[in-house]
């Protein structure tokens, strides 16, 4: 998986000697959500996300399996789907949390459309409105986390999910970062959903 490589020096270049790669050094510095350890990754994910969507978990587990097998495009595709499902769940929570009937009708039409960008724009604008009117309602980085992860994964998923002349040049480092960011994305979504359950917007 690119974490270790045979040999420790010029005199001992082969097995049974081995050393950490630069990528491996990066991996061992992290304490949680290591995609190289799918079991603990999922356990840690379930510890911070209350009642995780079983469909999200299924795609996340598949993404982890693909990652450990070195199938980076497939891993990114599965993670992108998990990200999209998470966002659609947020859209449903947002719809239920809207207090204005005309705004609910407007957002329902957007939800029924195929445009993910339109959905995200509505949700983003509404969250910005909430944060402007209630300073402590949500964490300061809510928009940044949602925007960065959603846009990143959506773009990569589109790149790997549609036939094209040139294959996407995904690196293990890139996908590693995506996997590390995903739990925080889901945690941020959970915080927004929790707010919407008790506050009409």
Language model: regions and residue ranges:
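Glycine-centered, phosphate/nucleic-acid-interacting loop/turn motifs that mediate DNA/RNA or nucleotide
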Residues: 2
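Short, hydrophobic, well-ordered secondary-structure elements
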Residues: 60-92
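Flexible secondary-structure boundary motifs
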Residues: 97-150, 196
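Charged alpha-helical initiation segments
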Residues: 12-73, 180-181, 195-201
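Short, flexible/disordered secondary-structure transition segments
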Residues: 5-6, 93, 97
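Charge-enriched, short contiguous segments at helix-coil
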Residues: 5-16, 135-201
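Amphipathic, non-membrane alpha-helical segments in soluble helical-bundle scaffolds
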Residues: 14, 46-53, 72-76, 113, ...
């Amino acid at each position: 998986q690119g974490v270790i490589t045979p040999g420790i020096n010029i005199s001992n270049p082969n097995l049974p000697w081995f050393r950490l790669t630069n990528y491996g050094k990066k991996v061992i510095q992290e304490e949680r959500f290591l995609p190289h350890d799918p079991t603990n990754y999922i356990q840690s994910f379930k510890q911070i996300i209350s009642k995780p969507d079983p469909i999200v978990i299924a795609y996340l587990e598949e993404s982890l399996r693909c990652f450990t097998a070195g199938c980076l495009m497939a891993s990114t595709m599965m993670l992108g789907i998990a990200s999209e499902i998470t966002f659609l769940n947020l859209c449903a929570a947002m719809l239920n949390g809207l207090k204005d009937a005309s705004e609910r009708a407007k957002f329902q039409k957007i939800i029924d459309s195929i445009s993910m960008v339109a959905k995200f724009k509505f949700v983003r604008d509404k969250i910005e409105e909430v944060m402007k009117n209630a300073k402590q309602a949500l964490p300061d980085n809510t928009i940044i986390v949602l925007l960065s992860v959603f846009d990143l994964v959506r773009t990569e998923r589109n790149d790997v999910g549609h036939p094209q002349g040139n294959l996407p040049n995904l690196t293990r480092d890139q996908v590693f970062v995506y996997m590390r960011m995903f739990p925080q994305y889901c945690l941020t979504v959970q915080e927004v959903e929790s707010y919407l359950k008790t506050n009409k917007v």
